[in-house]
Each structure stands twice: as C-alpha cells, then as structure tokens.
Amino acid sequence: MRDLLLGTTIPSYFSWLGLFPRFLVWFGFLKASFFCSSRNQSAGESGRRLKMKRAREDVHTDTQKRKPEVSSRGETNKLPRTIDALTYLKAVKDIFHDNKEKYESFLELMKEFKAQTIDTNGVIERIKVLFKGYRDLLLGFNTFLPKGYKITLLPEEEKPKIRVDFKDAIGFVTKIKTRFGDDEHAYKRFLDILNLYRKEKKSISEVYEEVTMLFKGHEDLLMEFVNFLPNCPESAPSTKNAVPRHKGTATTAMHSDKKRKQRCKLEDYSGHSDQREDGDENLVTCSADSPVGEGQPGYFRDYENREDTETDTADRTEKSAASGSQDIGNHKSTTKYVGTPINELDLSECTQCTPSYRLLPKDYAVEIPSYRNTLGKKTLNDHLVSVTSGSEDYSFSHMRKNQYEESLFRCEDDRYEMDMLLGSVSSAIKQVEILLEKMNNNTISVDSTICIEKHLSAMNLRCIERLYGDNGLDVMDLLKKNMHSALPVILTRLKQKQEEWARCHSDFQKVWAEVYAKNHHKSLDHRSFYFKQQDSKNLSTKCLVAEVKDISEKKHQEDLLQAIAVRVMPLFTPDLEFNYCDTQIHEDLYLLIKYYCEEICATEQSDKVMKLWITFLEPIFGILSRSQDNLALEDVSKLKNNRELQDACLAVKETASGSNRKHPISPKRLSKDNTKMQGSSSREDVSANIKVKTAQPDKLQDDAAMTNEVIQSSKFVSPKNDQIMEDEGNHMVNAASVEKHELEEGELSPTASREQSNFEVNGQNAFKPLQKVTDNVRSNKDKQSCDKKGAKNKTRAEDDKQENCHKLSENNKTASEMLVSGTKVSCHEENNRVMNCNGRGSVAGEMANGNQGEDGSFAFSERFLQTVKPVAKHLSWPLQASETCSQNDSQVFYGNDSYYVLFRLHQMLYERIQTAKKHSEKKWKAADNTTPDSYPRFMDALYNLLDGSIDNTKFEDECRAIFGAQSYVLFTLDKLVQKFVKHLHSVASDETDTKLLQLHAYENYRKPGKFFDLVYHENACALLHEANIYRIRYSSEGTRLSIQLMNSGNNQLEVMGVAMEPAFADYLQNKCLKSVNDEENHGLFLNRNKKKFTSLDESRGMPVAMERLNIINEMECRMACSSSKVKYVANTSDLLYRSKQGKPNSRVSEILKQRRISRFHIMLNCRLCALPL
C-alpha cells in the first residue's frame, strides 16, 4: 500500500511516527524478557491456550468491534494499550514456537523500522508475507498501524477457488456436448456466448446470467462452470435454481470488465464482426459434427494465477480450444506444451522438411491468427518453424588467423572508406549541380522558401556537413537560411575536395598494391607459426625416443618366442617404416651436407662428418661409395669414341647438375665434381635391381647410363641365368666362385683360411675381378671374346676355391660342433686367426691401402679387423643356414639411441626435400605453367640460407612464391641441417658409436649365406648392455627403411631351449604333419567342378584345375605341448581365389559374335523347315 493511494498525508505520517516508536520500545523490552526466561516459565499448556484464545479474542475485538476507535485514533491521540502489544507478541511467539526463524524475522523487522531503514508500507508488505496464512495475526496487526494504514484480506485469500486445468476444461466441454446431445441449439448457444465474450461484446455478468438460464435444470453444470469464470459478480441476478456463489467471487462487474479488456489488449484475436462467420461457425460446425470424445474442448482458461503477466498463455490456450483446429484427443496430449513458446520447443526429433524448417509436434496447439482470409489459409504457413541455427551471444567478427591477414583487412577497410568518400562526394556534387541548374533556369522560384531536404538526400547533407568538420552545423544552418548564396560556395568546395581525394586515392593505390604483394602469400599460411614452435620439440632426442617407445608398446603385443620355439624364422614387425622412392635425393643430400660442413664447420669436424656419411650412411642405403665411383668413371672415359655414349653422358651430366642450381664447389674442383655428377646421375635406378644380360649379343653395346648403373651397384650377385644384378650389401660373389665345401654355419671366429673363405673385402681391389667383366660388357667385341674372358675368369676363380678348400680340411672343429659343445675360443687363438687372415695381403692389405683414413676409426685395415672380433664367443643356439634373416637385397644394422636419432633426422631431411621436389614437379606439369623447373631455384635459395647470403624471412618468402602455402614445412630446414650435422659429428666422435660401426663392418664381411641376424643381435646386446637396441633395416627391393625397438618385452630375442617333448613330437609328426595317401582321400565336395576334368588324369588335370587359382596361406595357430590344444592367432586367415580371365580383344569378340549369330540362324531355319505347311 502506498501513502498517496491510502490518502496518508505527510503531517499525519510524521505525527504517527511519534506513537509507533513506543510500540517498538515495548517490543524491545518484551524481547529481552522473553529470551531471558525459558519456555518452562510459561503457565503450561492449558494456560497458553487460554492466553492464545484471549489474544485472538482481543484481536478480533480490536478489528471488528473497535473499528471506530481505530479510525478516530488520530483525532483522540489514543495510544494502543500495553496489554495489546504484550498479548500480540505472546501470540506470535506461541504460534511460531516451532519456527524460531519466523519469530526472529518479525523482531528484526521491528528493529529495521526503528532504525528508519524501512517505511510503513514496507512493514505492511513484509508482515503480509511473513504472516501469510495466519489471518488472526494479520488482522490483529492493524491495532498498531497509524491512521490511514490497514491490512485487508482479499476474497481470494479468504477462500481460494478450485484449481482447474486444461483437462478439466476439455472434460467440461465434452460433458456439455453429451448432456445436450439431443438439443443442438443449446450447445451452439453456449459456444456463441463464449465467442461474444471473446469479442468483448458481453461482460462476465452477462455471460453468467445467460449461462444460468441456459443450464436451467442442470445445477451441476452451472457449479462446474463457475470454476472457470475469472471473477463472477456476487450481485449477478440469479434464479431459484441458480447455484449460490461463495464469498471468494465478491468483485464488481466493472472491475472484471476492466481486467478482461486489459487482457484483450495484449492479444486481440478478432477485431471485426465478420470474424464470427470464420471462427464461431467453424467452431460450432466442428463441435456438432464430431462424435463424443473427438469434439472441440470449447472455451477454457487457467485461472490458478490471474496476474496480467500470464494472460498471454491463457489467451493462447483459450484460442486453441475455441478455434476448432484440433480435436479433443489431440488436446489431451497438449498439456505439456501449454504456456511453452515455440522458441523453447525441442524440435530436434521433429520431421525436417528443409535444412532450415521443421514441422511442429502434432500435439502442439497451433494458434490461428486473426485477419486471415481464405487465400491466406491456403498459402500461409502455420506448422513449419524455422530452426535456430546460431546464437546472438557470439559476435560476427571474422576469425583472423595471423598478422598478415590483419594487414590485408586494414587495407580493405581503408579502400572501402576511400571509395565511400569518393562516391558520396560525387553524388553530392551531382545533386547540387542539378539544384543550381533549376535555380538558374527559374524552375524553382528564388523568392519562395525552398526545402533543402526535398532536393538533397540525407547522405548528401551528411557529406556537406563532414566537409566542414566542426563548422558543419553552422554551414547547414546557412544553407537552409540563404541557399542561393551558399550553394555555389559549397559546390566549389565539394569539387576541390573531390580532386584532393582522387589524388589521395591514386597515391594509395600503390601503397595498397605493395601491401597486397607483401602479405598475400603470408596471409594464406596459418600453420607455419605453430609448426616452428612444435618442430624444435619434435626434433629433440627425447621426443623421438618417446615416439618409438609408444609405438612399440602399442604394436608389439605378441610374443615372438612362440615362433622361435617351432623353429620358424622370427617374425620381425617394424615399429616405423619410411619409403625412399627417389634415390636421386640422396645425391642432393650429400651435396647439401658437404656444402654446409665446408661453410660452417672446421676442417677436422667436416672430415669426420663426411667420412661417416660416405662409409656408413651411403652404403646402408645402397649408394655406391665415392672411391668405387671414381673407378667406374675411369672405365666410362675409355668409351668416349662412341658418339652415342657421349650424348648419353652429356644428358646424364645435365640432369644431375641442374641448370640453375648453386653448386657448392670451388672453381679448382669444378671439373672433378662435374665428372662425379655424371657418374652419380644414374643412381636413381640403383635400387630398382636393373639386370644386364651378358649372354645376349644385342645387349653388348648398351649405353653409358646402363653400364654405369652396373658399375655403381654396391653388391653384385651372379644368379643362375648369368645376370649381373645389384644388391645392397658390400660383397661381390661370382656364380663360378661358389665353394663346393661350405663351412658350418654359425662359426663366429674362424681360422685364417676360413676367415678368408667366409669374408670378402669391400675395398677397391675387390672390384678388379668384376672390372674385367664390366669391360667386356662395355666393349664392342663379339660374343666369342666375351665368352672366352668369362671362362678365363671362371677358371681362375675355381683354382682359388680349390686352394681354399684344401686349407679348410685342416681345421680342427666345425662351427656347429663349437656351438653344441659350448667350447669357448680363447682370445689368443682369435688374435692368431685374425693375424693369419691379415697375412693374406693380396686381399686385406690392398683393401687397407685403399680405404685407410687419417684417424683410422673407419679404415678397413689389418688393425681394424683386430678390433672387430666377435664380442659374444658362445651361443647355445644351433643356427641353421636357412634361419638367416639377412637377404641379398637388404642391409641390417643394430644401433643405440644415437643411431636411431641419426636415421630419423636423415629421414626427416629426406622427406622435406622430397616434398619440395614433388611440389616442383606438380607445378611444372600444370597446364598453365610457363616457368622452368622450380626445384633448382629452391635448392639455390637453400644454399644461400645456409651460407648466410639471405635471412630466414627472405627464404620463407621465396618458398611461398615457389610452392605456395604448403611450403611451411621447409621453413626450418636450416635448423634441421644444423642439428643433423651436429649429431653426425657426435656419432663420429663417440666411442660406443664407433664400436657399433666396427661391429657392423665385421658382420658385413661375411658372405651372403654366412650372415646371421641373431648372432649380430647378440653381439650388439653384449656391447650395449641395458641400453636401447634398434634394428634398422633397409631393403632396396622396396626402397624402405624399417626401424624396430628390440628391448620392449616380446621383441627381445632371448636364448632359450628348443628341445621338443618326445610325446608331442610324435603327435605332431603322425597326426598333424602326416601326408594323406590317395586311397584315403575322400571325394570332393564340389562334384560339379570334378566333372569338368573327368577326361583328364591327375597329372594333366591338376595344372588345368589350378589355372588362375591363387592360394595365400596366412593362417597361424599355436599348440600347447602339454594339452595339445590349438589356438588360432587373431587377424590371420587363409585365402583362396581365382582371378578373372582376361577379356578377349575386340577382334576375337567380333568373331565369337558372328559365330553365335550364324548358329542362331541355322537353328531358326531348321525350326522353320520342321513346321508343317
């Protein structure tokens, strides 16, 4: 309640302030007395009830019998009695004795009023909330209120109406239709009354009177109808059959009409009288024609809350019920949608008609809008809703990626603003000129008042205002007051500004073009920033080792010892695999590393790095060593008289060197290195296993490229068809030089003769026997001379082998006997054997002279052979020759973390250079490309970056200009090369790494059939102890490098016994591996296939039946020796399929087609002839 509404004046209010604080003092005294005394000090339960009764009687007396005293309190200035305050406070405490918080809240309220932090209206409002539901306390508090203030209880608060909901309204309408089923006029009249009320043509009183007359004799319907009325007047005329109203609806009709009009203003359903035909008649028709349970629910409202804020929901529900658009059955399921707006519905499960629209739920009450004619009903949409696809909480600013794109955006903003300025000033000039022309032609009277807004638009006026800056408003006033004088001056000023802005626009065009040129390519690159940050971390040793460990733990879950137990070749599953498909990149890497070492590193460091590269990395990847390259080039130079060969050499030279590449070669060494480039140009095809047949006359005069490929192969093997083929190892074995008496496999430390028999040297002199063969291939002599020299070489090789076999017979024990007996070879014997091997200076001595270095760490000499003796001298593993895992087309190396990181850095460098080369080739093959190959241009920029000629920014710009936004992986090449060279030097200087190199060289001295992977692994384990061991294998057949961590659980090859239990061995041989005789073989299941070959015997029918049949046996199983249970290995299976037969060519198809046509005609003629005439 407010002061103005209650008529309380300010003087009376302040006069009452002098009385009410006394009541607060009494409250304070009573509070202290009540809280100091315990509850046991009260007079007992019976006394408390008597006092409570007395208090209620006093309150009732004060509120009803003593009302004149309250109204005259202000005049007589009579104070409330002390006993009244005491009784009221006691009553409050007794009522809330179980709810101390409310009592405390009441006392705090009194304190706040005493401190003047709350006014009388605030006290009344809070008392009504605090004592809600306690009618006696609310009315009793009026005793202490000043004049003009009173707490009144509304009729609704005395007795609330019965709560009704949507289902009750539906049931009521259904009951009416059922009750008046025989009297259709009564039901239609009821609907008409509701529609008239909806159109504000009848008040609540009138509706009640008419419904009372309509429901005469149906008192139950009238009583139920009263519950749906908002405020039914107590004075409404009633008949003797009318149901008497309760006190809760004692509200005047005028008040009800006002509230109804207020609700109608919020949502007007119908504003014209002709809507009765569209709305009410439809309602009546649908209700009359529908059966019980499917009719219309009629008019209903939710009258639980009658606040104005809820009228929207009530009106929407009312309209849906009276519109006739849904039946009662549907309305029963719409209760969950009552009051729910469309934007809060969950439409994810609704039918999607288009990407933007969905159908409303079938049980949702659809509102029928007003002012809709027949055409609107046919065309307008009521059931499709646009789905929310975004949110306004997020800004619409573009997600900018980098600073270069920001520059482009700023440039675009400047251009847009400049264009808008020029456009606006041009438009203003045009309109001003038109206006002046009209004034000069007297089209517009000069004496009359001219409205400037009719001739100039708002944009033109704004342009003029901005033209004068701070004085723009004054100019606009002058323009309106004296247009004839101001317009010419403004026009001149506009033209001057237009010329000035045009010059600025022309000058800025150059600046904008420069900004675009500098930032366009950089703006497209949004990954380089993050790549640079992550690349330094990815190149670290810790990150690389952690990567392979994670892969190894996830990939290798099976135990390899199961396969070893059944004497099967261990299944090595690499953790990492990399492809080296382009061998020409190895030459580019060599030149790159060499150039960097010469420019940056010291001479000693450069020599160590390049020696490790030449003697270790290149042989691993099957690249011909530099010394062998020189020998091959000498042979090529002998064939210069061949014109065709000279042309081929020139082409190879141009291909390898490149036209635009910056060569890291001094002028003094230019001719020498150019010759090397010729020899190395054909290395791209080394790993492709190119074979040159020496027995065919037409291949005797091959070109220099093919001849050079044969010479550069790092390992030659002579197969049965007398072909010279390339391999990855460093051994050369002739077909005629195979020994007749081989050593026992697995011997780790042979004598001098056996050492020489098992090992072949990889030096320069090792190429001398092959040199004669290659000379014969390259010469122009006939086939006979080639055959004679080949026979001569074979005879010489056989003599050497006979001598070796004679010496082999003098050995005391074979290698297998040593392994089984466990006899250890003493170091003294080992040294003697190595010395005996060194005594054969015809091989090892010449090799040492050819490859001995300054420090001797990588030289293949006698002293080197003494340091690479086998570390593990005894193995309890009876290895067989068939168990060797080294093949002629692969190289195996066991190393530690340093070598693993070395190969990973090499692979990363190779991959990035390969990426540049692929992008260059792709760009060069484009149809619209007119520029030459961009790869030499890129390499030249990289060399300039390494020697400091350009900085990183220019190098990045050059890469973007060449390859585009995909070139971000090339930005850190200088960091990668620097880290790679530093790591190469670290490996070359480390003692453990050097021993691993020596062990690898020792194992590679074995013949191809004498190399044992397990022996090599055991020696590496003995050397590295607990450190990580990596198996690094390069296969030239597939040009793939595989890396496997050998220390992770199941991958470790531990020595174990392989003895098989006799019972299990008998079961395996007799049951599982027993071959089935022909007599025991049962018939085939597919008999139709057998009939095709019944005319053939087994020997001739089997090849025909197996034609185009492919069988892949990959099913693996494991058998327990104790229980003989078989367990199949997951992800393994056998496969049998027959490949499709090749389609015949068009000529054969045509012949077959003609044959079929002819056979058809013959058959048709026979049938026609057989027909009776």
Swiss-Prot record:
Composition bias type Polar residues, residue spans: 320-337, 750-765
GO cellular component: nucleus
Region (Disordered) location: 40-75, 236-337, 655-697, 740-813
Record keywords: Nucleus, Repeat, Repressor, Transcription, Transcription regulation
Ranges of biased composition (kind: Basic and acidic residues): 55-75, 264-276, 301-319, 778-810
A Pfam family recorded for this sequence: PAH
Keyword Cell membrane among UniProt keywords: no
Domain of life of the native organism: Eukaryota
Residue ranges of every copy of the PAH domain listed in the record: 79-148, 162-232
Record keyword Glycoprotein present: no
Gene3D superfamilies: Paired amphipathic helix
Protein localization: Nucleus
GO terms of molecular function: transcription corepressor activity
Protein name: Paired amphipathic helix protein Sin3-like 6
